């Protein structure tokens, strides 16, 4: 399980750890402002804020664990015990894969209010990065597999 902490004393401080027993090749990664970000079910993002964070890079795509953008908006993708839940792609929603969530929010939100607005129309779609890098198990598939 990952842990994050926010400390406020006039300013905001954010930190997190990666409770991992293995090294996945994570490193500090910078996505420069306006470097094209590709999404599976949404248009490419050509114009956006710069991002810095902990990530692994696969196929020239930053798989961010956490980060902060040039406007000071920060977030982390935390791992919680138990299965996740994803949704089918939905018309009229911002269909985002779980691995796209951190760069999507940080690339486009200049405030927490903007991040909340983006999240209100977000649909975390059931999309794997690749056959080798799959999303956390969906609770439906976990239930089905545990009943056998």
Predicted features along the sequence, with ranges:
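Alpha/propeptide regions of enzymes that mature by internal proteolysis
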Residues: 91-123
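Conserved small/polar residues in nucleotide/adenosyl-binding loops
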Residues: 142-148
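Active-site periphery "cap/insert" segments of enzyme catalytic domains
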Residues: 113-141
């Amino acid at each position: 399980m990952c842990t994050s902490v926010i400390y406020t004393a006039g300013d905001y401080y954010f930190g997190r750890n990666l409770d991992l027993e293995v090294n996945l090749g994570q490193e500090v990664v910078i996505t420069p402002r306006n470097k094209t970000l590709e999404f599976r079910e949404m248009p490419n993002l050509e114009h956006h804020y710069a991002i810095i964070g902990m990530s692994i890079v696969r196929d020239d795509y930053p798989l961010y664990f956490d980060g902060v953008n040039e406007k000071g908006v920060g977030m982390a993708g935390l791992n919680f015990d138990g299965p996740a839940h994803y949704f089918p792609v939905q018309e009229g929603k911002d269909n985002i894969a779980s691995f796209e969530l951190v760069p999507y929010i940080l690339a486009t939100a200049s405030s927490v209010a903007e991040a909340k607005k983006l999240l209100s129309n977000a649909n975390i779609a059931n999309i794997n990065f690749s056959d080798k890098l799959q999303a956390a198990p969906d609770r439906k598939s976990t239930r089905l597999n545990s009943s056998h």
